[in-house]
């Protein structure tokens, strides 16, 4: 008779014979370290460091690391193109300073281009990295000549898995960051963005983020000072989240403008935990009216939640006559489709510019106005809180007064 212990031992022997050895299952391989490149800085604004940086991207861009070291200035006198980067890690710990030449930048689309790149980290690990667009001369020239074409600081089109973090970006000639071209999975976090003029000419059109045709874009933990939209959801924006952002001097968190010359759609956008300081509005929607060459504007599933309003002219605004005057819109009413628009948890105090009005909601008479408002506790400096409404639903959620415009 075979004992139970014997059966157990025989079973172990069988298992030991059947199981492959460690050497049979573990491949013989060596993990190679990531390539790392540090471009050589020319040390003078008369030397363009872009070729050296692009050579580093060519050498180390395929899965490697490119380092802009601390306490070092790189002078960029031409467009920096990230072509050649694939899953690369571009670490800015020093200063990238672009030339202020208005002659060179006139008509250029961007200062930094990221086109059809799959995998890019553009970041500062230590938080000391700065990208300086050196835009003062461009702002001054634009004040004299509005036909002057200024570049975007960082232009992302196409591609996926883009991360921009830890940096300070300052003084772009035009927009800070533009995302379009069906870009997917882009994250922007822990950024400081400021456009501050040292002349009487304002830093016009310095949107912090223009988010166009793209999916799954996240903007979080960003402090912005500028003179245009804080974040603009442009045509084609889909699944965009904005949270824990503060904006000073801006035109707000804005959908649009939409419908200027084509049918435009923005959908599935969510903005929460936003602090808006001294801005023309905290949040809003801008759509062109019907008629002429204008297209149909559609905004679906947009939520604005937990906004602190500090000295903004309006807490929330809906414009259905954007870009046209009242006479035009009387003949060609707004026809925008607004569906699933949620505004909730707004607190704070507006500026005295529109006192006692704190919100101006002018939906188009030919359109759809599916808007709900709750927890809206914004006051004007006088202590009143008047909300102007036009063509809004009866279950809007707030008490309306007539006289909406825009």
UniProtKB/Swiss-Prot annotation:
Sugar-modified residues: 244, 273, 278, 301
Disordered as annotated region, ranges: 20-49
Statement: the UniProt record of this protein carries the keyword Iron-sulfur: no
PbH1 repeats: 183-213, 214-235, 237-257, 266-289, 299-320, 368-390
Localization, UniProt: Secreted
Entry superkingdom: Eukaryota
GO MF, any single term: polygalacturonase activity
InterPro entries in UniProt: Glyco_hydro_28, Pectin_lyas_fold, Pectin_lyase_fold/virulence
Principal EC category: hydrolase
Keyword list, A-Z: Carbohydrate metabolism, Cell wall biogenesis/degradation, Glycoprotein, Glycosidase, Hydrolase, Polysaccharide degradation, Repeat, Secreted, Signal
Pfam families: Glyco_hydro_28
The keyword Heme is annotated on this UniProt entry: no
A biological process from GO: polysaccharide catabolic process
Signal peptide positions on this chain: 1-18
GO CC annotation: extracellular region
EC number: 3.2.1.-
Active site: 228 (proton donor), 251
Main location: secreted
Family of the protein in this entry: Belongs to the glycosyl hydrolase 28 family.
Record's function text: Pectinolytic enzyme involved in the degradation of xylogalacturonan (xga), a galacturonan backbone heavily substituted with xylose, and which is one important component of the hairy regions of pectin. Activity requires a galacturonic acid backbone substituted with xylose.
Protein's recorded name: Probable endo-xylogalacturonan hydrolase A
Species lineage: Eukaryota, Fungi, Dikarya, Ascomycota, Pezizomycotina
Name of the gene encoding the protein in the UniProt record: xghA
């Amino acid at each position: 008779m075979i004992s139970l212990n014997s059966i157990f031992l025989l079973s172990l022997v069988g298992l030991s014979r059947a199981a492959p050895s460690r050497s049979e299952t573990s491949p013989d391989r060596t993990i190679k370290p990531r390539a790392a490149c540090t471009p050589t800085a020319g040390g003078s604004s008369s030397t363009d460091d872009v070729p050296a940086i692009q050579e580093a991207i060519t050498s180390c861009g395929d899965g490697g690391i490119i380092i802009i070291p601390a306490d070092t200035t790189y002078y960029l006198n031409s467009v920096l193109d990230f072509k050649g980067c694939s899953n690369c890690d571009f670490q800015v710990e020093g200063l990238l300073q672009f030339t202020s030449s208005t002659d060179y930048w006139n008509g250029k689309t961007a200062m930094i281009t990221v086109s059809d790149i799959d995998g890019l980290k553009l970041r500062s690990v230590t938080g000391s990295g700065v990208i300086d667009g050196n835009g003062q001369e461009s702002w001054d020239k634009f004040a004299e000549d509005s036909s002057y074409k200024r570049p975007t600081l960082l232009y992302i089109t196409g591609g996926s898995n883009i991360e921009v973090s830890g940096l300070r970006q300052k003084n772009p000639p035009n927009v800070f960051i533009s995302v379009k071209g069906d870009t997917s999975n882009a994250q922007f976090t822990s950024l400081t963005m400021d456009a501050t003029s040292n002349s009487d000419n304002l830093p016009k059109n310095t949107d912090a983020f223009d988010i166009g045709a793209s999916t799954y874009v996240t903007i979080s933990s960003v402090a912005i000072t500028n003179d245009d939209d804080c974040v603009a959801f442009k045509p084609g924006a889909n699944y965009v989240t904005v949270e824990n952002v503060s904006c000073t001097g801006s035109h707000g968190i804005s959908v649009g403008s939409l419908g200027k010359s084509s049918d435009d759609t923005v959908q599935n956008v969510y903005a929460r935990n936003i602090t808006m300081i001294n801005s023309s509005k905290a949040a809003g929607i801008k759509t062109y009216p019907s008629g002429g060459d204008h297209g149909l504007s559609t905004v679906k599933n947009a939520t604005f939640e937990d906004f602190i309003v500090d000295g903004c002219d309006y807490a929330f605004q809906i414009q259905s006559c954007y870009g046209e005057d009242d006479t035009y819109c009387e003949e060609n009413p707004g026809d925008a489709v607004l569906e699933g628009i949620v505004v909730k948890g707004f607190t704070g105090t507006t500026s005295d510019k529109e006192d006692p009005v704190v919100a101006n909601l002018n939906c188009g008479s030919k359109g759809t106005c599916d808007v709900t408002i709750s927890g809206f506790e914004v006051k004007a400096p006088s202590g009143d809180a008047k909300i102007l409404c036009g063509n809004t639903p009866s279950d809007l959620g707030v008490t309306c007064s007539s006289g909406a415009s825009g």
